C-alpha cells in the first residue's frame, strides 16, 4: 500500500484525503475551515483529522499533494513581491503610445537595447552594461527579477545572458540563486506584451508561494509527515514543490484543475461535464478523453490574460454559503457574496438565537435583520481609527448589523466600513444561506437547526411567504442557477456569445426549460449529450436537480465532498516543450530550440536534430519536477498554405514539434517508526485546533 495525502485549500474549507495510490481507494477524508490569516492552521487541522480518521501513522504517508488558490487570489487582489521587469529590445515609445504600460504587471520597468526578429536574428547587441547597472541599482530593493526579450521565443540568447548576469550580481536566497523569471521558459507562443506580463506576474508570486510551501512544510513536519511535497498546476498535473516555487504562475487555477482530476478518478468518467459546488463558488469544466480541457489561449485571472495554459473553467459566485437576500422588489437573490451560515456561527455563539428571536418579535424587521458580523483578527497595518474601533467592537462575538446600523457611534456608514473590512478578510459576515435552508428542510443537520429556522422566519416575513416555501425556493433556485451557468459555459465553448439580457426570447425559452415559468403553456426540454459529475460538499443537494433540467445523467461519486483533495494526488507529472522549424529562403531551415537556434539544409534533418536534443533535456526536467518512469511522445504539425493558381501546390510555412513527458510522481520511502496511535493523532489535532 502506497499512501498519499491530498490537501486542497478552498474558499471556505480546507480538505484533506488519504488515498491508496495502488488501489485508488480513498482511505479517509476530513475538512477544516480555511484560515485566511494563516492557511497552515486550516491545513494542520484537516491533515490531523484525516490521519486520525484513517488510523494512519504520519510516517506511512509516501507523498503529499497540495492544490491551492493562493496564486490565483494573489493576482486578483494585486498582491505579490517587489519585482523589476527587464525588457530587452522593446520600444518604450510604442508601449506608451498604445497604453501597454498598464498591461506589464510591474511598476519598475527597465528598457534595455537588444532583442531579435521573428526569424531569431539579432537586431541589436545586448546592452550588458545597462543591464548590469539596472541590477546593481536594485540590490536590496527587489525580491525577484522578470526578463522578457523581444522575440525571445525565437532566440532566447539575450534572456539567458541577462539571467546569468542577475544570478552573478544578486546574492543567493537560502542557498538558492536569486529568483529570476525568463519569458521563454513560461511560453513558446508569440505576444511580447502578454509574455512580459506573465513573466512579471510569475516573479511577483515567487515570494508568496515560497512562504506558503515553507510554512506548509513546517506544518507537515510538525505532524510527523516528512514525505515529498507536490503541488498541482493549473492543467491538473503535479510538480515538486521546489519546481512550483520557481514557476508559481503555473499554479493558477490549481484548485479547479484538481477538482476535475479528482472527479475523473472518483467517477470513472472520461467524457463529462464537472460541476464543483463548494461553499463560495461553483466551478464548471469539461473532461475530454479523461483529461481536463485546457484553455490554450492562457488562463484569465482577474483582469490579466496570462500565457499559462490551464484548465478551461467557468466560475460563478454560487455555493452553499452564498448570501440569500431580498431586493427592493421582493425578489430573492442568492450570492455572489460568501457569508457564514447562521446555523454554523450560532453553533459556536448560541447568543445569536436570542437576537434572532428578538428581531422576530419586533413589529417590523429592523434593517439588516438576520445578519451579524464578527472580527477575525485584532487589526492590520494601515487601518483608519474608525475601522480599528469597529474591529474592537466586533471582537467579543457576533454583533447584529441592525445594532451597528443604528449605533450613534458608527451610524449608517458602519455597514460600508464593514464591507471594506470584509474585503480584507478581517471581518466575517453571517446571514441566511442555502446551507441554512437545507437545515430547515431536514436535508442537512450538522449545526444549529433553531438558528437556521429563525433566520428563515425573518427572511420569509420580509418576503411574505412561509419559511418552508422560502427554503424550497432557495434550493430550487440554486439548482436552476447551476444549470443556467452550465448552458452558458457550453454555448461559449461552441462559439456562441451568450448575452441573456440582450436576447429576451432565448432567455424566455431557457426559463421555461428550467421550470421558472410553471404556468406557461409552452414546455421546453434540453438534453445534454454528456453526463454531469457533481462534486463538492453540497453537490448531492443541488446538482442532480440541475441535471434533470438539462436531461443529463448525474453522477455523484463517493467522497465527492473531497474530490479536490483526491485530485491533488492522483494526477501525473506532465511537462511539454514546443520547438519550431521555420524556412530561411528556399533551401535553409532554422530550428528554434529553447537553448538557441540551429540551421539545416532540410526539414527532416532539423526534425531529427530536435528529436535528439529535446528528449534528454525534457526527461531531466521531468525528473526535477518529481517524475519517475518518464515516457516522452512527440506530435508533429506541418504548416502549409495553398499557392494561388498553383494547380493544388502548397508552400511550406513551418513545423511545430510538441514533446510531452509523462511520468508518475516519485514517492518517498516510508521508514518504520514507532506506531503513533489514534490517541496521539487526536493530541496533534487538539494542539492544531
Question: What does each of the following model-derived ranges do?
Answer:
Residues 1-672:
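N-terminally biased helix-coil "hinge/interface" segments that flank
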Residues 671-689:
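Short, low-complexity, charge-dense intrinsically disordered segments
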Amino acid at each position: 500500500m502506497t499512501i498519499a495525502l491530498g490537501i486542497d485549500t478552498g474558499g471556505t474549507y480546507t480538505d484533506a484525503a488519504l488515498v491508496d495510490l495502488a488501489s485508488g481507494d480513498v482511505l479517509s477524508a476530513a475538512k477544516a475551515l480555511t484560515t485566511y490569516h494563516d492557511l497552515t492552521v486550516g491545513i494542520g487541522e484537516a491533515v490531523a483529522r484525516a490521519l486520525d480518521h484513517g488510523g494512519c501513522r504520519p510516517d506511512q504517508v509516501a507523498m503529499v499533494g497540495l492544490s491551492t488558490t493562493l496564486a490565483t487570489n494573489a493576482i486578483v487582489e494585486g498582491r505579490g513581491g517587489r519585482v523589476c521587469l527587464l525588457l530587452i529590445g522593446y520600444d518604450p515609445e510604442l508601449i506608451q503610445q498604445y497604453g501597454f504600460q498598464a498591461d506589464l504587471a510591474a511598476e519598475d520597468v527597465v528598457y534595455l537595447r537588444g532583442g531579435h526578429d521573428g526569424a531569431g536574428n539579432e537586431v541589436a547587441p545586448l546592452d550588458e552594461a545597462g543591464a548590469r547597472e539596472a541590477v546593481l541599482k536594485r540590490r536590496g530593493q527587489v525580491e525577484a527579477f522578470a526578463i522578457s526579450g523581444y522575440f525571445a521565443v525565437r532566440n532566447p540568447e539575450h534572456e539567458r545572458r541577462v539571467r546569468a548576469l542577475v544570478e552573478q550580481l544578486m546574492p543567493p536566497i537560502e542557498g538558492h540563486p536569486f529568483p529570476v523569471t525568463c519569458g521563454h521558459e513560461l511560453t513558446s507562443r508569440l505576444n511580447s506584451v502578454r509574455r512580459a506580463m506573465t513573466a512579471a506576474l510569475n516573479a511577483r508570486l515567487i515570494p508568496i508561494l515560497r512562504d506558503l510551501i515553507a510554512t506548509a512544510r513546517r506544518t507537515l513536519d510538525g505532524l510527523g509527515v516528512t514525505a515529498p511535497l507536490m503541488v498541482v498546476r493549473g492543467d491538473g498535473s503535479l510538480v515538486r514543490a521546489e519546481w512550483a516555487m520557481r514557476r508559481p504562475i503555473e499554479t493558477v487555477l490549481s484548485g479547479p484543475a484538481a477538482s476535475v482530476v479528482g472527479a475523473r478518478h472518483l467517477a470513472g468518467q472520461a467524457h463529462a461535464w464537472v460541476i464543483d459546488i463548494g461553499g463560495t463558488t461553483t466551478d464548471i469544466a469539461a473532461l475530454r478523453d479523461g483529461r481536463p480541457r485546457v484553455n490554450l489561449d492562457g488562463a484569465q485571472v482577474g483582469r490579466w490574460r496570462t500565457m499559462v495554459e490551464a484548465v478551461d473553467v467557468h466560475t460563478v459566485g454560487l455555493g452553499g454559503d452564498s448570501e440569500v437576500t431580498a431586493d427592493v422588489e421582493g425578489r430573492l437573490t442568492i450570492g455572489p457574496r460568501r457569508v457564514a451560515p447562521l446555523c454554523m456561527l450560532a453553533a459556536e455563539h448560541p447568543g445569536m438565537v436570542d437576537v434572532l428571536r428578538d428581531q422576530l418579535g419586533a413589529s417590523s424587521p429592523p434593517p439588516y435583520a438576520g445578519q451579524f458580523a464578527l472580527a477575525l483578527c485584532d487589526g492590520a497595518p494601515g487601518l483608519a481609527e474608525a475601522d480599528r474601533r469597529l474591529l474592537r467592537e466586533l471582537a467579543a462575538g457576533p454583533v447584529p448589523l441592525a445594532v451597528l446600523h443604528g449605533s450613534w457611534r458608527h451610524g449608517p456608514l458602519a455597514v460600508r466600513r464593514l464591507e471594506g473590512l470584509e474585503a480584507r478578510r478581517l471581518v466575517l459576515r453571517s446571514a441566511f444561506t442555502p446551507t441554512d435552508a437545507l437545515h430547515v428542510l431536514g436535508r442537512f443537520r450538522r449545526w444549529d437547526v433553531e438558528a437556521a429556522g429563525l433566520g428563515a422566519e425573518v427572511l420569509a416575513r420580509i418576503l411574505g411567504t412561509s419559511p418552508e416555501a422560502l427554503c424550497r425556493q432557495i434550493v430550487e433556485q440554486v439548482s436552476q442557477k447551476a444549470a443556467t451557468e452550465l448552458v452558458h459555459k457550453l454555448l461559449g465553448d461552441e462559439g456562441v456569445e451568450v448575452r441573456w439580457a440582450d436576447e429576451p426570447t432565448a432567455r424566455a425559452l431557457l426559463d421555461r426549460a428550467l421550470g421558472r415559468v410553471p404556468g406557461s403553456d409552452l414546455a421546453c426540454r434540453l438534453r445534454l449529450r454528456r453526463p454531469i459529475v457533481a462534486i463538492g460538499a453540497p453537490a448531492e443537494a443541488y446538482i442532480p436537480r440541475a441535471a434533470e433540467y438539462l436531461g443529463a445523467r448525474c453522477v455523484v461519486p463517493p467522497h465527492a465532498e473531497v474530490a479536490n483533495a483526491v485530485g491533488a494526488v492522483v494526477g501525473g507529472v506532465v511537462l511539454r516543450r514546443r520547438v519550431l522549424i521555420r524556412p530561411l529562403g528556399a533551401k535553409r531551415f532554422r530550428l528554434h530550440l529553447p537553448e538557441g537556434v540551429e540551421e539545416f539544409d532540410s526539414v527532416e534533418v532539423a526534425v531529427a536534430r530536435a528529436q535528439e536534443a529535446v528528449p534528454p533535456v525534457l526527461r531531466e526536467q521531468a525528473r526535477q519536477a518529481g517524475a519517475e518512469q518518464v515516457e516522452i511522445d512527440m506530435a508533429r504539425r506541418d504548416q502549409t498554405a495553398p499557392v494561388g493558381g498553383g494547380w493544388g501546390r502548397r508552400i511550406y510555412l513551418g513545423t511545430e514539434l510538441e514533446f510531452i513527458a509523462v511520468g508518475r510522481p516519485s514517492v518517498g520511502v516510508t521508514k518504520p517508526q514507532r506506531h503513533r496511535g489514534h490517541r496521539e493523532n487526536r493530541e496533534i489535532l487538539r494542539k492544531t485546533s
